[in-house]
Amino acid sequence: MLQYQIDRIEHQVADDRAQSGVFLIGPLERGQATTLGNALRRVLMGGLEGSAVTAIRIAGVNHEYATVPGVREDVLDILLNCKELTVNSRSAELEIGRLVVAGPAEVKAGDLQFSSQVQVVDTDRPIATVADGHSLELELHVERGVGYRPVDRHNEETSAIDLLQIDAVFMPVTRVNFTIDETAVAEGGSARERLRMEIVTDGSITPDEALAQSANQLIELFQPLATVTLVEEVPAEPEPSAEAQIPLEELNLSVRAYNCLKRAQVNSVSDLMGFSYEDLLEIKNFGSKSADEVIEALERIGISIPQSRTSA
């Protein structure tokens, strides 16, 4: 298998703490760059776990169309500002951040007080502007998740009248682009490829971490296929017919024929179906007359047995 290497040739951090990285992966066999690029991009854009603000509580507010006295932004603007916060929670549980500010004040993300499990990445992002003589009290809920989660107004846990839910975007990767370049021709004339991948994150994780997490997800996805064992299906035994379940007594055979069959451990029609005419004649004290009697009794219920073993 062709060995390739991964080089990060570029890494930048924007003013809002978003990060971008460019990676070169190669050399690869023809077609492998497309396979890797598509698979990694799909996981990067929708399969990684991230953190987001999922709900907000504002003192004195019970719906999103309200205004807060002394605050320049209305509640909808505050909700939007909180939705755009970039946070990184290391806890699997709900984390709650709080803020109490007296004006005049320019409230920013860095003013929020969380536990040590939560990091606010873009601390300079504005939240609200409080005028002199007024105050603002906020409570933010932060959770971890995957992909996009719309507001669920029927959830009893989050349906408190003063808890304003937010559509949560948990995706830490905001953009992925890749291109494929042909490299030198290998021995035998086959061209090699190189995958150039650009990954942009919101700053809650680095591009290197995003690439590693997506690769590990793909490994977990494909690993069971490497050890798959095909189990041969055993055909199910056919269900015996109702006629086969008829006990020997119900065939109304003569006493002689009945006793001979019983001594031969024949107890039902199902047992008789394993015999041929020749087999019946080999039963001790079982002559052709008794054999003919059995054949006729079986024919009355629609069952026939072969004349000889070879024709079975």
From Swiss-Prot:
Gene3D superfamilies the UniProt entry points to: 5' to 3' exonuclease, C-terminal subdomain (1.10.150.20), DNA-directed RNA polymerase, insert domain (2.170.120.12), RNA polymerase, RBP11-like subunit (3.30.1360.10)
Top EC group: transferase
Gene Ontology terms: cellular component: cytoplasm; DNA-directed RNA polymerase complex
GO molecular function: DNA binding; DNA-directed RNA polymerase activity; protein dimerization activity
Documented EC number(s): 2.7.7.6
Region span, Alpha N-terminal domain (alpha-NTD): 1-229
Entry keyword set: DNA-directed RNA polymerase, Nucleotidyltransferase, Transcription, Transferase
Quaternary context: In cyanobacteria the RNAP catalytic core is composed of 2 alpha, 1 beta, 1 beta', 1 gamma and 1 omega subunit. When a sigma factor is associated with the core the holoenzyme is formed, which can initiate transcription.
Function of the molecule: DNA-dependent RNA polymerase catalyzes the transcription of DNA into RNA using the four ribonucleoside triphosphates as substrates.
Listed HAMAP family: RNApol_bact_RpoA (MF_00059)
Designated name of the protein: DNA-directed RNA polymerase subunit alpha
Species lineage: Bacteria, Bacillati, Cyanobacteriota, Cyanophyceae, Synechococcales
Gene name, Swiss-Prot/TrEMBL: rpoA
